[in-house]
């Protein structure tokens, strides 16, 4: 039995409703993973070219500082030079040549192939991310996040049909040792879901241990390289325009070992990037193009995600404002720049500044998700569960945001216009021969599931019925859903034999009994 599936009800109307809520083939669903965006274009063609040219100038005239010794070797071997200021300069011709040979149309694999992603063109996928240091409960109380929280988040993501991949969302603050934190972050993530996983590491040795574990789960190193189901989120730059030493060392190993990398530049407009939105975008495009050259110098054609995460400051305080309209515009524009290069693009959306799942949270997430998704951004990170400008994570918001993402996906699909959908004959029949309404028409019943999207948590009942059922708000309904999933859904895709072997060789800190139903 699928623990994620809604429980069937036995009485007539509820049984019919449950049947309608059953899974449809992807081709018939009103929404599905990888829907085609691209209708919203915040930048004109001239704007895109201007940003591209500015990025090339920044790389060739300003360059990046603080390259590692091995990074210098890789970059100078393909044509980079060193300026009088000791910065790595990237000739325009080198950047253009790299763009011509960079990896395109590469899948992001999952442990279960049905969750494989095809993030190219203008296909849209929403997923989690972040390094929140707190959990927020249904009452709004904050506490430090731990390893069990990370595992529980992944278990819920595993059941959320509109959350298409799971990138590490919280920091296990109960693990002070950096090696144990990195290893267990990866272990808990891949154990909690069969969807594609993203994680990060602070030292190459930590990554080596995780790779050994991933080889065991895959069956062998060769099988891992055929279908790498974990990608590395790598903040290889410290904006503005500097390399990050530890991250670059991990980047080199990941590329060599066949792990896809998210080249993540997260400059904050008004703080670590220009306050002018166009300038912030140009800087981040330049930084990610530098990362692309770096990756291809290590291994030509290695899979790399163009990760322009343009963050925004509230200029009154200097603090990050992840739920702002400027954030929506920058992330949408970042997706548009990735289309210009025909690269798999990753950007961020859903980073509300609200501390709890309130009206502010819904408004900020809704406008950001709708704009960024309709811009056709391929991989939309931070999309579910986040609060307080990435400082907090809520399980209740995770399931609420699954609904918000679903609504955004429905706007991406748009309105299908053809002879049948224009409905001339249906209108004529109802007006001339029928009852004067469409409630029971064949077309209405046929399109009920394929044309219309219904919320999982959103309430559409009349006020009297809502009151009779306890007047629950969406947070209360989400809390019930979360507790039900946590009590019933324990993924078992990694065999007990493989798990025991992993535990025999590595310091797994997640108790096995916490990974089984009580």
Where are these regions (language model features)?
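Structural signal for hydrophobic packing residues in well-ordered secondary-structure cores
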Residues: 47, 59-66, 79-82, 99-106, ...
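Helix-rich catalytic cores of soluble enzyme domains
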Residues: 141-378
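Glycine-rich, N-terminal phosphate-binding loop and its surrounding beta-alpha-beta segment
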Residues: 65, 69-141
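N-terminal small/glycine-rich loop or linker at the start of catalytic domains
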Residues: 27-31, 47-49, 54-56, 118-139, ...
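Glycine-rich phosphate-binding active-site loops on the catalytic face of alpha/beta enzymes
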Residues: 370-392
């Amino acid at each position: 039995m699928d623990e994620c599936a809604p429980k069937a009800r036995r009485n007539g109307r509820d049984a019919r409703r449950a049947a309608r809520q059953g899974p449809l083939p992807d081709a018939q669903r009103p929404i599905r993973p990888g829907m085609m965006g691209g209708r919203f274009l915040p930048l004109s063609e001239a704007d895109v070219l201007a940003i591209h040219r500015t990025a090339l100038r920044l790389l060739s005239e300003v360059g990046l500082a603080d390259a590692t010794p091995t990074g210098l070797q890789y970059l100078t071997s393909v044509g980079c030079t060193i300026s009088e200021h000791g910065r790595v300069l990237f000739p325009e011709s080198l950047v253009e040549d790299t763009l011509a040979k960079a990896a395109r149309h590469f899948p992001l694999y999952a442990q279960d192939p049905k969750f494989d992603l095809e993030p190219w063109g203008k296909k849209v996928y929403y997923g989690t991310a972040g390094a929140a240091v707190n959990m927020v409960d249904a009452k709004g109380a904050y506490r430090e996040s731990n390893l069990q929280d990370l595992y529980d988040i992944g278990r819920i993501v595993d059941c959320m049909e509109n959350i298409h991949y799971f990138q590490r969302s919280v920091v296990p603050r109960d693990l002070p040792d950096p090696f144990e934190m990195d290893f267990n972050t990866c272990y808990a993530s891949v154990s909690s879901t069969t969807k594609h996983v993203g994680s990060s590491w602070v030292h190459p040795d930590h990554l080596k241990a995780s790779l050994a574990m991933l080889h065991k789960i895959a069956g062998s190193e060769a099988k891992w390289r055929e279908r790498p189901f974990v990608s590395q989120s790598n903040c290889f730059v410290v904006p503005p325009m500097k390399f990050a030493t530890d991250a670059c060392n991990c980047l080199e190993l990941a590329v060599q070992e066949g792990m896809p990398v998210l080249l993540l530049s997260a400059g904050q407009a008004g703080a670590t990037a220009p306050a002018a939105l166009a300038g912030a975008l140009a800087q981040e495009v330049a930084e990610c193009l530098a990362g692309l050259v770096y990756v291809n110098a290590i291994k030509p054609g290695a899979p790399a995600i163009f990760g322009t995460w343009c963050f925004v400051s509230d200029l009154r305080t200097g603090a990050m404002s992840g739920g702002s309209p400027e954030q929506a515009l920058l992330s949408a524009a970042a997706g548009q720049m990735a289309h210009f290069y025909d690269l798999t693009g990753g950007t961020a959306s859903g980073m509300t500044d609200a501390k709890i799942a309130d009206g502010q949270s819904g408004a900020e997430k809704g406008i950001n998700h709708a704009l960024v998704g309709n811009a056709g951004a391929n991989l939309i990170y931070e999309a579910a569960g986040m609060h307080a400008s990435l400082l907090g994570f809520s399980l209740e918001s995770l399931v609420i945001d699954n609904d918000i993402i679903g609504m955004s996906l429905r706007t991406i699909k748009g309105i299908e216009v053809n002879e049948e959908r224009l409905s001339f004959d249906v209108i004529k029949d109802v007006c001339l021969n029928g009852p004067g309404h469409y409630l029971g028409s064949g077309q209405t019943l046929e399109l009920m599931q394929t044309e219309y999207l219904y919320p999982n948590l959103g309430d559409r009942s009349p006020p009297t019925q809502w009151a009779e059922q306890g007047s629950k708000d969406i947070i209360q309904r989400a809390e019930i859903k979360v507790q039900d999933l946590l009590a019933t859904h324990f993924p078992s895709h990694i065999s007990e034999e493989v798990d025991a072997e992993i535990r025999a060789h590595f310091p797994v800190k997640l108790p096995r009994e916490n990974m089984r139903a009580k």
